[in-house]
């Protein structure tokens, strides 16, 4: 008997007294909770996202599609970045105005190699206003999870308003639970028992979010 068979055997034994006609999990759990708190316009929802991102100490920028490449170039220059990690499906135009060395995301890249990269630029899957959360799902323009956890500086682009939702339930409706989801609420931060905050222990110390709207 292998490990898989042992685990499944324990599950079967635990369920032996459950009636066959017992309702499924989806039916048994009530999901009539509110999908969002309050009634906001699209503009107010975007503003709430910006406020909560800033409250988590993320740095928020706003631009339109035409100004995006210039803004990213300026952020990398201000940061002093000599290299930037690039997901395979990132829009090439986003980095068209910077001469920073581009490092391609490779499966064989080691944590030490990723740690030597100064910045990473990604898109996102959805942004949640009520919690100030950015969610990545590992799509080609976002890359694998570790490329946004190892470099110290993360620039994340959010298209507004189409990628912005009010609440977590609304965000979950857009996400595939089978994808490798990374939920980001501000730069990495942790506190010890005395509430001394330390940033950068579990991810980037600096998170810059660019809200890209219509011109």
Each predicted region: which residue ranges?
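The feature marks the mature, well-folded catalytic cores of soluble enzymes
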Residues: 1-215
């Amino acid at each position: 008997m292998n490990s898989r068979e042992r685990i499944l055997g324990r599950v079967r034994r635990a369920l032996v007294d459950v009636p066959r006609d017992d309702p499924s999990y989806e039916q048994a759990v009530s999901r009539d909770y509110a999908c969002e708190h309050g009634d906001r316009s699209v503009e107010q929802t975007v503003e709430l996202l910006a406020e909560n991102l800033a409250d988590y100490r993320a740095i928020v920028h706003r631009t339109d599609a035409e100004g995006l490449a210039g803004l990213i170039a300026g952020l990398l220059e201000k940061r002093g970045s000599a290299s930037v990690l690039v997901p395979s499906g990132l829009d090439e135009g986003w980095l068209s105005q910077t001469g920073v060395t581009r490092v391609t995301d490779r499966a064989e890249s080691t944590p030490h190699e990723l740690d030597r990269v100064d910045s990473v630029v990604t898109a996102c899957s959805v942004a949640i206003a009520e919690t100030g959360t950015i969610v990545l799902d590992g799509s080609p323009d976002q890359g694998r999870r570790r490329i946004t956890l190892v470099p110290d500086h993360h620039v994340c682009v959010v298209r507004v308003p189409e990628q912005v939702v009010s609440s977590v339930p609304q965000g979950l409706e857009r996400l595939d639970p089978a994808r490798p989801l990374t939920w980001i609420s501000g730069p990495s931060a942790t506190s010890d028992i005395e509430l001394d905050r330390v940033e950068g222990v579990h991810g980037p110390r600096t998170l810059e979010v660019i809200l890209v709207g219509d011109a």
